[in-house]
Every structure is written in structure tokens, then in C-alpha cells.
Amino acid sequence: MAARSAPSCHLRLEWVYGYRGHQCRNNLYYTAAKEIVYFVAGVGVVYSPREHRQKFFRGHSDDIISLALHPERVLVATGQVGKEPYICVWDSYTVQTVSVLKDVHTHGIACLAFDLDGQRLVSVGLDSKNAVCVWDWKRGRMLSMAPGHTDRIFDISWDLYQPNKLVSCGVKHIKFWSLCGNALTPKRGVFGKTGDLQTILCLACARDELTYSGALNGDIYVWKGINLIRTIQGAHTAGIFSMNSCEEGFATGGRDGCIRLWDLTFKPITVIDLRETEQGYKGLSVRSVCWRGDHILVGTQDSEIFEIVVHERNKPFLIMQGHCEGELWALAVHPTKPLAVTGSDDRSVRIWSLVDHALIARCNMEEPIRCAAVNVDGIHLALGMKDGSFTVLRVRDMTEVVHIKDRKEAIHELKYSPDGAYLAVGCNDSSVDIYGVAQRYKKVGECVGSLSFITHLDWSSDSRYLQTNDGSGKRLLYKMPGGKEVTSKEEIKGMHWASWTCVAGLEVNGIWPKYSDINDINSVDGNYVGQVLVTADDYGVVKLFRYPCLRKGAKFRKYIGHSAHVTNVRWSHDYQWVISIGGADHSVFQWKFIPERKLKDALHIAPQESLAESNSDESDSDLSDVPELDSEIEQETQLTYHRQVYKEDLPQLKEQCKEKQKSATSKRRERTPGTSIRLHFIHGYRGYDCRSNLFYTQIGEIVYHVAAVGVIYNRQQNTQRFYLGHDDDILCLAIHPLKDYVATGQVGRDPSIHVWDTETIKPLSILKGYHQYGICAVDFSADGKRLASVGIDDSHTIVLWDWKKGEKLSVTRGSKDKIFVVKMNPYVPDKLITAGIKHMKFWRRAGGGLIGKKGYVGTLGKNDTMMCAVYGWTEEMAFSGTSTGDVCIWRDVFLVKTVKAHDGPVFSMHALEKGFVTGGKDGMVALWDDSFERCLKTYAIKRADLAPGSKGLLLEDNPSIRAISLGHGHILVGTKNGEILEVDKSGPITLLVQGHMEGEVWGLATHPYLPICATVSDDKTLRIWDLSPSHCMLAVRKLKKGGRCCCFSPDGKALAVGLNDGSFLMANADTLEDLVSFHHRKDIISDIRFSPGSGKYLAVASHDSFVDIYNVTSSKRVGVCKGATSYITHIDWDSRGKLLQVNTGAKEQLFFEAPRGKRQTIPSVEVEKISWATWTSVLGLCCEGIWPVIGEVTEVTASCLTSDKMVLATGDDLGFVKLFRYPAKGKFGKFKKYVAHSTHVTNVRWTYDDSMLVTLGGADMSLMVWTNEVESHREKKYCDSEESDIDSEEDGGYDSDVTRENEISYTIRALSTNIRPMFGVKPHLQQKEPSVDERQGVVRGSRPPVSRAPPQPEKLQSNNVGKKKRPIEDLVLELAFGYRGRDCRNNVHYLNDGDDIIYHTASIGILHNVATGTQSFYQEHNDDILCLTVNQHPKFINIVATGQVGDSADMSATAPSVHIWDAVNKQTLSILRCSHSKGVCSVSFSATGKLLLSVGLDPEHTVTIWRWQEGAKIASRGGHNQRIFVAEFRPDSDTQFVSVGIKHVKFWTLAGRALLSKKGLLSSLEDARMQTMLAVAFGANNLTFTGTISGDVCVWKDHILCRVVARAHNGPVFAMYTTLRDGLIVTGGKERPSKEGGAVKLWDQELRRCRAFRLETGQVTDCVRSVCRGKGKILVGTRNSEIIEVGEKNAACNILVNGHVDGPIWGLATHPSRDFFLSAAEDGTVRLWDIADKKMLNKVNLGHAARTVCYSPEGDMVAIGMKNGEFIILLVSSLKIWGKKRDRRCAIHDIRFSPDSRYLAVGSSENSVDFYDLTLGPTLNRISYCKDIPSFVIQMDFSADSRHLQVSSGCYKRHVYEVPSGKHLVDHAAIDRITWATWTSILGDEVMGIWSRHAEKADVTCACVSHSGISLVTGDDFGMVKLYDFPCPEKFAKHKRFLGHSPHVTNIRFTSGDRHVVSAGGDDCSLFVWKCVHMPH
């Protein structure tokens, strides 16, 4: 028997030879204790050079590849590779885990770094995006994450001198990051001309924004900010792998084998060339360097660690060596000394001293070494090579004895015979050669039986036999030395083996798992003395088994540390140690063997010894000596709780089915029924698969659960209250230490835990996101702040929560076996225990993870299954109850004793003040003293002891006890049979509540005239229940078989019951005694019915597809109804008792005539006319509407019609009880729905007077009683929810503005494309025309300084001659004319008591001073702002949040985000990147100002709540499938908010981290319909007001509509504002101005009275988009981009801001001498703006869209070109039309006066330019035009002498024409000599440099050269304004860029004197005025 249990001895890791130098850098440091920390394989090593001792950190599961040291130098962070890699932060002193960071990275963790104070840790992943992640490591929480780079990142560091800044570097890049909120934003380092773009390998940050970095070519690059400022060339001659900074300066180490020390300013101090030292060698490469004081640590590529003392730097000290890169396979031990020999593919053979832990000899061979052996006398060492040769060396001086090559393939194994005479050599070519040692290794034999390569060899003790294993897993035996194969069984029996290293053979059967045929065990070695066997496998595991182990699947102890395959393992000669070697990690592990007798002492000496690793999970999957599992527990472990369809899947399923319904719902459907039901009482308690789920609350009520309901039972009044927040089975329940809150966990795909208040029955927090399938155990901590939960997924995940915040603190995989219970340590909140199938585990928290140890049973017992557990009186005492009836007592992790407590499992135990109480399967309750020494008292649960006041009857004596709890002088007991009992201390037992036992319940019947009902179940009982207030079970009877249906006779005296074996019986309804029984069918009887009236006939339906009709009086079968093709599900009689209606499983609705059973066909129209005695059918036209949209996945199982035939109740497979109006014609009827049952509802019945509805849950075994509440109009009781499966088909209303806003698609700046339909080759890709110089063959720069040729004329006429020309070096935004009102709302607010207003346009936030008109800007957004809100809390004064558009959801810089900033100083306080796509359309601060709500534009319209100061996302959930316009917090709340949108209003609550929502309920008002809602405001007492598309305002109380303010406005109500100080409400709508109405209204707090304000804008319709109220003023933003201030007293309007209504603004012209400019736009207006006065001076409505505008040279005339081809000339003085003309049919793109004012040039999209002579007067006759323009005209410029015109066209070509003839000029020399009056062309060699590399899809759209002729500004499709020098003929010229506009800058101009630049926006309809900053003289 013992052979299959794990051995009781133990291995302890003592030493690791090696250091990981390959593929890793910067992984070697000094700790504060002057120890050295590094890693190798999967082990972190702390080495003390003083004591020559190693400590090990073994918390990783795979190769460690990165390491960082905390600034205090005690803590270490390490990162590993793997599919789900994690980071451990651990203490280098205790080598215990402090925190585990996981669930974010994939592939591996490449770099780690702590910040200055060590609070945060940054990590970089190995995934394709090289994700960068910042952690709050103590809490195990991720703060921020962003894609790092498209290529590998090699190093990352925090800037230790600037907070929240990091630097990362890698392949061909360096990035400078800033962290703000949850946003990590990178800026790429600019290499510029200073150095080549190349790979940066390491970096260090210094003061003054300096960063030093080491490059691949050996240079050091020095950065200031993001720019490269200098390089230190040749710092190393090859790549610099490591850079370390310390107080004295910097140390660098490189591939050239040198260490360089630098001072703090990076001036060189010294060089140490390790290759030149005595330990050095050619090719030495430094991977890691650490400089501390006078010591330097160096790690090399070849796994050495050197320590250098600075003043003796030529004498480095070698403190660690290991094998270099290359697989390590060869291992042998010396036969007499404590030495081990290893040989590797690095071609070295090394000898290690196991005592001194040191390398004592090394020899390099010619070939890679694959195996080794030492002869018995220890003199010869044989090495087998990869090339098929073998070499023999003398051990003492490593000289060669012989080298033999007989084979061509690798030698895998060789062994000397025990007598030393022979050497056996096994090869890859399947042969074994035998050599004679004495004959100088002459070949004496050969074994050729194998068909595959040889893997292992062993000699027999007498050296006469050899056994081999080969690659196919075969074991063969040979006679020695000849090599004849041995097959005789007799001969084999007698062999004794000198060693056992074979993996195949009887003795080692047990090392293989039971059902596997894989060969992943690489090596074994038997220890005959200790009777143990050690194995090495491909998964990095070393295992100990008993030896011999004969039976497959033996138990073992396992040890991890190696990363991948362990290639070989051997005992040392005296069995003191085990040596194991790793193939890929090329490390050598030395383990100390601790025999059984020393185990106890050993455990106490070594604290870092974690037993969890040794006594592994797999090693005890099925110990043979564990007793059989108890039947009850076995049944329970087989429950899966999987669902075909989870409730979470319903929304998606509905979406998928949406298509089918479109057609179905065109008909107007019935409203929901007028009645509602309310859950009244539940008969049932879930005891059969749950434990300890029954408690007393603070006030003595009893809390438990059944189905999906949390029940609070009041035993005085016999009433129940219900928590109905769950939507599926509750599996566990725990009570808060104060006994007022309860936590319940449910089944689900992503199951949730609800923490709720037993008094108010409101949820306090909902926890989800970390479990799967369900939650089987929960427990509160002693302080009540934390909660532990266990899931039922395969690894039984354990999660620790801060439940109030809803935050996960830690998570870990619990165990492969089922966990039954979790308990938190009442004394140490970071500790907990879990217990379950064959295990007890003790856990402690470590950051985001938990570290577990298995309970250590020792010799006291065996690993039993634990059913319950509690903590005792000190933190290390724990008690657990087992499946065999014992109680185990634990101290720390050790079992100290067991006490027999019950017969059969102990299911529940509870700690009391002075002792314990236990309950078991034997039906006994036992009270114990405080040390479990003696049992004080036992109570048996027996029928005899039932007290008279019991509410029901005990089914049997001694039911299995599943839950037990004490309080109020009583013991509360819950049984497996579904009973809840109260045991008085003196003995009497009161039964309080009961239900059916395990087994489905289907049969239900209500009595014809009494409030009682009968149920029958698969639990083989028939029960009668009292539905009157006594709520008890009146009678019960056991049946021989389970039953599925029952029915009372019409007189109520008899009860018919159908059983599952095809029989049925009739019983006396009072005594339940048999009257008569029949057995005519084989299958289940599914329905049974007495005919109405006298009850003469009984119809019995079965799954045999027949209905039998019996005559009751004669007890004879009189008819059979045949013809059904499937089993019968429901039957009903008509009221005459003549006709039967039948439903079948094939969805047939059939009719039969009684009593003979003849089938009738009845047209569906007629069916309605028939009067039915009962209706329980689910088929037919009358109930078509009860089938849901997702009918494929769910069946309607039951229905029942009220006697007044008004309301049909149904039950379905998803546990919903629904009420429909009858008849429910038309598909997908509207209904009221109730969730309480968990899975299928099997039956529903109204009582005889319709006062109650009784429903049965199939699998939840509960009988629920609901009261019918017919609503009166005064008293509105609302139901759980009122819905239909699809959105109401009624139209939500129509309005053009709403439709536009809903359908708008926002362009992302980065994805912007051409605004003009350009075609052709871009200028920077065209073949360049040669210049004059080039044509003349002049080499550039070689033209003589003095030349006879006339000087080239100026390109541009300079207008400000006389002044020195000063180039412009910067542009500063000074004014923005524009406001985004067209598709945003509530985005204008007062600040500073109404002195300033804040609003936005394009991507800038604008603070505008009301008195002076001055503006300041927030310019940190990188794309359009869509929403803005102001924090109202006095603590957060002037704090603004703005949300922007974005594309991706990968959290990179282009993701949608919210910025929170200070409006006064424009400081960004936080950036919140959203993980959804498209953009953020609404933001709102909570009452305390600490939370922010944001709504996304993604298809789900995600609603997210943030703690904005930390950048933490608290909760997030899809809001609605259609557009949400606004969501706002209630002004007095941090948890309630309301969202409104297209046909949508939802009332939300934040509970912990979960968002719960309720739809607005309309049914309370007769003809209310769900309209599109546009705005929201709030009143006291939970009142909410929503503005609708029709102009009504809806008033809601909680979530129920209570009144409608009809026509509050005549058009949509777009904006509402709640004034906090007085509660008054402002509304803004869209309406035509009228006498009494107005687009803005001010209302009282209840929205009963109002005052209207008219906006005197002169518009036909005013459309208000934003309202805000200050002191005596109302601030209004309109659709027409005006911001108006209205006085409350005098109603006077003051327009503060004007802007164009619609864009693009194509036309822009600046006045020739004054600071004025004109703009012309698609909205049909031309506007005149004054820069000095900061306002619009005038506007002209043209009635058509305008495209271009131009001043005459004197500034007295204006020419305007229209979109329809017309152009107009106005006189500036009077704005009168001087002339107009329309010679073209399509848009005029540019219009220009010639500099001499004589000609007007008009360029159009008809590929033409027309010339008009203005001297001929206002008739405007065309004098000529330019032909042959290949595409539409974009821009035109006149020459200074008015004789030429340059034209840019839509095919990227520039042409020059003569004026006025229109002749095309092609002579390049002539063109080069023209001086231009203006330059606005985007084409031409002079502006080649403005075209950027990144313009595949987007273009430069406009340009303008300054009047001084030396600066150039451009605008482009990306919305950027760029400043260049002019001319800029070089491609990709240097420039400065200025953001602010939305995509498409349409025009740009300098004002006179180059004082300002004006830019016009396309998408944003805004005009920006930039101040020019000139370079000083």
C-alpha cells in the first residue's frame, strides 16, 4: 500500500551554480545587507559573499528574465516568461513574496524599474505591442498601461528628478513618457543631425532633464528633454549593454569586455578591461554592472560574476561561475568523493566541489559534450560527444587517455561496469558498444537489439548484464560483454542492478501518470539505501518517489526551480545530495537530502522552506488509502452548475435575433397587463449542496437563501422579506460580523457577489469580474472590511476583495480539487484558510496575489476531505471538520490532533464564546468545550422532539445537518431536506420553514375553493401547503416513485397524482391515503386533469404521447387520445367537459373529444370562441406573444390564466415569471417580468380566487407564493421590470438636429483624409524640374560671389521695406472665434462668479473674460473636444473636465480620453484614457467632486465611473444600444446618476464597482410613450426631469414617470440646468420666437411655473444647446455658435461670442492695412472681425454658401465668390453691392484683385480663371480667361506688376498665365524671374519642403507667405498649422507645428505688418488668431 503514497523524506535546495547572463541585462545588484542578488533559471538568488551562503526565492513558475532593485535596496522585483507571466516583489532578507502582479502582460516581462520613492513599479511586456505598465505594487493594482513600441524595448527607467516621467529605449528608438491620470503618453526622442538613428540598449536619468543612454555602436547619447544634444563617441568599441548610476557617477559595461566609470557630468574616470585580467578571455562580454562605493559587480554573457575593488581594479575576484550558453546534458558523480562532473554543448567539462560549493577544475574539449561517467576507482572520466566520439581523461590533471570515434551520431549515455572492467557506450544510432578498460578501450562487444536511439543504461551488480532504454520507451537486457539479448523470464528474475537510471521497467512504473504514454521524464536515479527515487522531467520539475514504485500514478513530492527541461539528475556517492542540471538554463542545482527522521527538525529550521511546493497538488489526486467518499459529498462534487444559456448572454442573443423581429413588430402590440404580483412567501431552503448558509441577523431575524433569492424570515410574524438582486442560483451566503450585512454569491458566466443590507434590502456593493461559472464560498473578515470568495472554475480561484470599494485586492488559483469553504483569519486580516476535497490550505496575501501552503498532516493522519473550518482562539489555531466525522485541530500549518465528532461527514461548525458547535450527516448537533476535549451536549433532530408551534412536519428523523448557527438562546439548524429548525438549549425543536428535498419539482395544483395547494416532486413526496398566513406544510406523504403532476377534483375531496413510472393514483385530499391507482403506461405521467363540473372524467397525459380518459365513478379507462407525434406537455378541458386541448413537445396544439378521445381539427379562429375551464396551454394564437425573441434557447414551460381571463402568467426555462395581457396575440408581447427562480420555472397556478399566484422552480425546488396586486390609479406599486423583448416600435419623435447629432461620424485627426478631391502625384514625389542653375550646369554653392548676370529678383515683393526683416519664430494663440454648439450640449459654463465663461471649440478649451473679451486656452487635447463640465464642489474650484474623440481602444495616445484641468492656470490634473472606441460624448462630476462619469460613442455607449485624481476606473458598463446624449450625477449623490438618449432614460446606481440600472417605467401614465430624451435636471426627493424631442418635460419619481409637463417648449428640449443654490431649473429648446414663448425658460423647483426669455438674435428659429445660470444671469449657447448672456430681471440679451454656424470656412481675407479680417463660409454669411476689439463687427447674409473672399489693394472693396458660381463685389463703407455676375455654374474657389486694382481674377472648379476689367464699371464683362488648366483651381496669386498670375490646380500642378491675355507661360527662366505680390500657393519648388512624409491620404490645404517674404505658414488636412522659413525648397523642411484646429484647416493668412496669422477651420467652423512672435534683433 505504502508504495503509492508520497515518500516522507524531503529535498532542500542548497546551492545553484550559474547566473543568467544570456539575453538579459542589468540583473545583478548589491542589497542593503551587502549581499548580491541575481537570478538563474526560475530562481532568484541572494548570495552572501561573507558567509558564502545562498538564499533562494522560488515564487516563479518559469524562467526569470528581468530584475529591479527597490531604492531602499531590500526589496527586489523579478519578472518571468510564460503565457501568463507575472511579477513578484520579494524581500531579499526573508526571501518571502511581498506582492504578486499579474493578469496584464503576456509572453513575458522584459524590463522592470521602481520609481524614486519605490511606491510604483513600471514593467514592459514581451508582447507584440511591448506594453508598458505602471503598478501600485503594494496593492497589486495596475495604474496605467499603454502600447510601448512596435519593436523590442530593452530598458526603462523612471526619471528620478521629475515626478511622473519615464524613459524607455530599444530597437531604433528612445521614448520620453509622462504619466498623468491613467494615461501614459510618449514623445519620441529626436535624433536630429546630432547622431544616427540607432538602437539604444540602456539608459540612466540625471538632473536638468538630462538622460544618458548607451547605443549599439558603443557611443553614449546624451539627451536634453527629448532632443539629442551630444554624443560621446567610442565610449566602448561595441554595444553598451548596461548602465548603472550611483552617488559617485555612472558605470557602463559593454560587449567589448570593458567597464568604464564616469563622474556625475559623464566625464571619464577610468576604464577596466576585463579581457586583459588574469581571469579574462577573448570574447568576454559584460551584461550587467553595479557600482556601489568601492566595489563593482560585473555579470558576463558566459554566466560569471566578478567583483572588482576599485583601487585594485586589475585583480577582479571571480565569485560565481556556470556553464555558458548551449544545452547542458552531461552529469556524473565521483564514486568516492563529494564531487560532481558536468559537460555541456559549450564544450567545457567542469568539476564541482559539493562541500565547498565551488568550481575546482575546468577543461575545454573540441566537441560539444553529451554524457559523462567516472570509473569505480575515480581515476578515469569518460565523456561522450555530440559527433559520435568519446574521450577518456584522467580526473586528477584532465589529461587525455584515449579518444575513439566509432560512430557518426551523438553519444547519449555511457557507464562503467561495477567491476571497472568495461565501458558501455550508447549512441543515437540505436547501438551500444562495449569497450574493455584494461585493453586501452578496445571494443569487445556490441548490443543491437534497439530500434531507436539509446537513452539510458544500467549494469547489474555482478557486471554480467546490461539493461538499456531507448527512445521508443522499450527496455532491453543484454549479456555482457558479448551483447547477446536476454529474454528468459527466469534469468531476468535473478538480476540485481548496481544502479537504476532507466525510466522504463517494473521498479519505476509508478513514476508515470496513470493514463499517459508521453516520454517527458528525462532522467531518474534510485537511492537503494533511502528507498527513494529521484526523477527529472521536461517541465522543470524534480520529483521524489518511493523506490521501488510499481503501480502507475504513484504519489511524489515535487520541487521547482529549473525553468524548462531538467536533463539529468544523480545522487551523490554518499546519498547526501541530489544534483540536477537544466538543459536550457544550463544551471546546476544541488539539493540536500533530508531523511524522514530529521524531517520534523528540518521544518523548524528553514523558514524559507515552503512546504506547499514539496507536497504538490498533483501528488495527492487519489491516494489509495483515502476512504470512499461519502455518498452525499460525492453527489455534490458531481454538480457542475453549468448553464446552456447564462443570463449575461441574453442581451447578445436578443441582438442576434433582432433581424427576425423587425417584420413581426410592425403591428401595435398590447400594453402590459394592469395587474402586478409581489413575492410573498417561499417554501424552500437550499441545503442539499450548500453549507453554513443560515444565520441570525442583528434583530433576530433569520437570513438564508433559496433559488435566486436572499430571504429574511421573521419568526415572530412568520413573514419573509426578499433580496431579489440576483439573477441565478445563489450558492453561498456569509454574514458580516455586525450581523447587519450579508454577502451572497451566485451562478453565472461572470458570476457576481452581492453585499446587501438586511434591513433596507438594498445592495451595497456588487463584486464581479474574477470568477467563472459560480461562487461557492464567501467569508467576511473580522473587521468587516474585506471579503474572500472562491469560484467553481477548474482552478477554484480565490479572490480577496475590499468590498465597499468593489476592488479586487488579490487573486490566486486555489486548487484543482473542489473547495467547500473559505475562512478569514480573525486576528490577521491578510491570512485565510480554504478547505475542500482532500486538502486544507493556509494562505497569506502578497500584493495582488496569495501564497498558499498545504496543511502538513505528517504521521497523524491522511489528507482527508474537509467540509468546514473555523479559526480558534489564537491566530495560529484552526479547526476543520472532515468527511469521515473527525475534527482536525491545526496549529499553524501542522495537524496536531484529531477528535471523532460524528458518524459521517461534519458539515458545519461554528465557534462560540466558550466552545464550538458542530452538525453532521448523522442528524446530531454537538456542543463542545473550547479545546474540543469533551462533548458537552448533543441534540438529535427527531420528530418526537418537535414543539407544538412548528410550521410543518419533519419528513424523517436525523436528517443530514448542513448549516448550524447560534444566537438568541437557540441553535439554528438547516438540513439537507430543505428544513430550517430552531433548537432550544433545553431540547424542544421548532420547525420554521421547509421545502422540497433534492430532485426536480413539477407537479402543482391549487384547491378549488380553499387557499391551499398540493405539490409532487422527484423527491418522492406529495405535500399539501397552506397558503393562508400560517404558511406551513399541512401534510406530507412519501410515494414509491417521484411524480410530475397532480390535480384536485372539482369538489376538493380527491387528489390525483401522476408518477414517473407511468402509473397514477387518487388519494384522499385530507389524509393523503390511497383511494385507487392504475398503471397503464411506461413513461412519465406529465399532466392529469379532472373534467369540470362533477369531475366525472379524469384525463391522464403521458410522455408515451397518449392521453387516457378514465371514468372516475366506474374506475375504468373509457378513451384514449391518439395522434400526437411527441410527448404531451399540457392538457386543458373546455368548460362543458367535452373537449380536451393538448400541447405536445413537438409544439403541436391538438384537440380531442371526450370521453372517447376522437381527434378534432378546429380552426384557430374558433379556438378563441371556445370557453375553456382552465388555460395552461403555451401554444396557439391566443398566446403567440408569450414566446420570447430568443425562443430557440428558451422554452415557455408553463402558463395559467386568471379566472376573469384577463392576465396570463407564464414561466420559462430562464427562471422568469411573466405576466401578459390575455389574449397575447401578435409576436413578442409586452410583459412584466419577475426574477426569483433561478433556472426553469416548471409550473404556475393562480389560486381559486386569483388572489395569489403559485410558482414552482424545477431545479431550485422552491414553491413561491406571489400576491396579485390589482393596481388602482392612486396607488402605483411598480413591478420588477416592465419590458418587451424588443424596443418599442413607436417612433421616439423626429427632429433634424437630433438626427444629425445621432448620425454624425466623428473624424479622428490621425485618420483624416483630403477635404478636396485631389488626384495626381504629390509634389514631393514628382520628378523635379531642373532649376536655372542646374540647367546651366552650375554646381550648387559654386557660383562666384561676383557675377555679371543680373541678380535674381526677389521671389516676393516686400511690403514693410525699411524695417529690418525679422523672421517669425513662434505663433501664440490669442483669439478663437467659434463655439461648438452644433452637435454638443451643456458645454458653456460660468466660472469665477460669472466674470468668466468657459466653453470649447475644435480641440481647445476656452476661458473667456466677459468684460474684456480676452481669452486663454487649454491646448493639451490632441483631437476634437465633444463635451465639457465644471466641478461644482467648493474643494475643486475651477476644475474642468473635457472629453475628446479618438479611435483606438488600445489605450495609446489616440484613444478617446477625458482631461481634467484647472481653468485658471491650465494645468492638466489628470488624463483618463478610455478603452472604448470613437469618443467621449458626455462628462459629469459627482456631488463630492471626486468621481467623474463619462459616456462613450462606441456601439455599446459605455458608461464609466472614474476616481479622476488617481486615474482609476471604478466601474464600466454598456449604457444602451443607441446613442446616449447626456448622463449626469444627481447633484446630491456620488452613486446615483441618470442617462438619457434615443428612446432611452435609465436610472443608475453605483454599488461598489458595479453599475446597476433601471429603465424608466412609463406604464403608470395611460398614454405615455418612450420618446427620445435629450436633457436631464434634478429636483429634491428623488425627482428627475428629462427634456424630450417633442418639447415635453417628463417628471420622474425614482424611476417611475409621475407626470408630463406638456409642450414646455415648442420643439426639442436640448438643454436643462439645475441651479444648486436655489433648485431653480433652466430649460433651453428649439423654437420660433413668439410673444409669450421663448427658447429659454426659468422654472421653479417642481417645474410647475416658468418665465420665458426671448433671445434677440434675429434668427427664424432659436435652437438652444446649452444653458447655465449664474448670479442673476442666464448663459445660453446656441446651435448658431452664439453665446448669449440673458439678464434674469430685464431679459436683456448680450451676445458674448459669435461664430460661423456651418463650415467649412473656405474664404478668408485680411485687410491691407488694419487689424481686420473677413471670413466667408458654407453658412451663407460673410463676417467682418476686429482683432483689437476681439469681436465680430458685422455680418452679411448672402443667402447662398460663400467660398472665397478678397479685399481690394486699397481695402475699399470686397469681392466674394459663391458656391453657385456667382461673385459679388461690395463697397466696404456701405456694404452695398457694387456689382455681381454669374458666368459659371459651379463653385468659385479663389478670387483676386490685381495689385494695381485694375483686374479681377476669378478661379472656379470648372478648371478656369476668368479676368474682369474693373475700370469698365460694375457691368463686369469678362475680358478673357485662362484655358488648359488640367483640374479645378485651388489658389491664385498675382505678380507684383499685375502682369502674371500663378494658379495651383487639383492635380498638384502649378501654372503661370499672362494677364490679361490668359496665355500659358512655360519658360522656366522667365517664371523664375517673376516677383509675386502674394504667395498662397501650396505648389512650386519654393514650397517643396511643406509636404510631409505622412501625407498619403491627407494634404497641405493652404499656405501664405508673410509680407516680409521670409516666413511661411501652412494649414493641412490634419488640422495643423505649421510655420516654415520661405523659401523652403528642400524636402521635409524643418518647421514648428501648432495644434488646435479640428481636421482640415481650410485657409490661412498673415494680417498687415505680419502681426498676426489667422487660420480658418473646416470641420470646426472656427477662426483662430495667432500672435506672431518675431525673433529679437
UniProtKB/Swiss-Prot annotation:
- Tell me the PROSITE patterns matching this sequence: WD_REPEATS_1 (PS00678), WD_REPEATS_2 (PS50082), WD_REPEATS_REGION (PS50294)
Q: Where is this region: Disordered?
A: 609-629, 1276-1297, 1323-1363
Q: Where is the composition biased (Acidic residues)?
A: 615-629, 1281-1294
Its chief place of residence is cytoplasm
Q: Which InterPro entries match?
A: Beta-prop_EML-like_2nd, Beta-prop_EML_1st, HELP, Quinoprotein_ADH-like_sf, WD40/YVTN_repeat-like_dom_sf, WD40_repeat_CS, WD40_repeat_dom_sf, WD40_rpt
Is Repeat given among the entry's keywords?
yes
Keyword Repeat among record annotations = yes
Q: Where is the composition biased (Basic and acidic residues)?
A: 1326-1337
One GO location term (cellular component): microtubule
In which compartments does the protein localize?
Cytoplasm, Cytoskeleton
Q: Where are the WD repeats?
A: 59-100, 104-145, 148-187, 195-233, 235-273, 280-321, 323-362, 406-445, 449-488, 561-601, 725-766, 770-811, 814-853, 861-900, 901-940, 996-1035, 1038-1077, 1080-1120, 1236-1276, 1420-1471, 1475-1516, 1519-1558, 1568-1606, 1608-1654, 1699-1739, 1741-1782, 1783-1822, 1895-1934, 1940-1977
Sorted keywords for this record are: Cytoplasm, Cytoskeleton, Microtubule, Repeat, WD repeat
Q: Which family does it belong to?
A: Belongs to the WD repeat EMAP family.
What does the record give as the function of this protein?
A: May modify the assembly dynamics of microtubules, such that microtubules are slightly longer, but more dynamic.
Q: What is this protein called?
A: Echinoderm microtubule-associated protein-like 5
Q: Which organism is it from?
A: Mus musculus (Mouse)
